[in-house]
Amino acid sequence: MAEKANNFPPLPRFIPLKPCFHQDFENDIPDLHRTTCKRLYSLWMLNSITLGVNLIGCLAWMIGGGGAINFGLAILWVILFTPCSYVCWFRPAYKAFKTDSSFNFMAFFFTFSAQLVISIIQAVGIPGWGVCGWIATVGFFGTSVGAAVVMLFPTILFTAVAVLSFVALTKVHRFYRGAGGSLSKAQEEWTTGAWKNPHVQQAAQNAAQGAMSHNDPQYSATPNYGYSNQM
């Protein structure tokens, strides 16, 4: 089996770095899960954009007299959280839907729960933490209305990310439990090393895709019940 070339992130040619991951929703993710997986990717994009908008909000905060510490931390959050959120929770979700891996689902639930807590803290907006949340923004209206209005944009985005993260977590967890997933299955994958075996992963992916395209049970000898399989 030929190894698929990495294509993400799609870096310009003048940057002397190569993509680190292979990402192909159409060929990797079964039809049943593709929409959910794409929505998780869109949520990651929204979170990354929100961190960028927060950087602008913290710049306005600093110009309005709020100090430089928030702006400095906002730069750190963009540099740190954008790639880490992709690696720590989106990639496990992508691989979980791709190979129906309980271990990767558990990794996603653990890291994405942390992401949800972080999103709530960001939406709250504790002053001095480098985020334009509600406490920081509302409190700054008395100092600089113009800066506070700019800070309001990332505040709303942080709130949206927190709400959407909660919805996404509950939806994926409901699907996982409904499909028979459990912690014991994840522990079994960890013990056997199946979660990192490419041959096992490919077999699981083929099985998952086959299950999506053949919804009827398969038997060694299929009886004729007097109906046609033609649609």
Swiss-Prot record:
GO BP: any one term: positive regulation of cytokine production
UniProt-listed InterPro entries: SCAMP
Localization: Cell membrane; Golgi apparatus membrane; Golgi apparatus, trans-Golgi network membrane; Recycling endosome membrane
GO CC term (a single one): recycling endosome membrane
Membrane topology category: Multi-pass membrane protein
Principal location listed in the UniProt entry: membrane
Transmembrane segments: 40-60, 68-88, 103-125, 149-169
Cytoplasmic-facing ranges: 1-39, 89-102, 170-231
Name of the featured protein: Secretory carrier-associated membrane protein 5
Organism lineage string: Eukaryota, Metazoa, Chordata, Craniata, Vertebrata
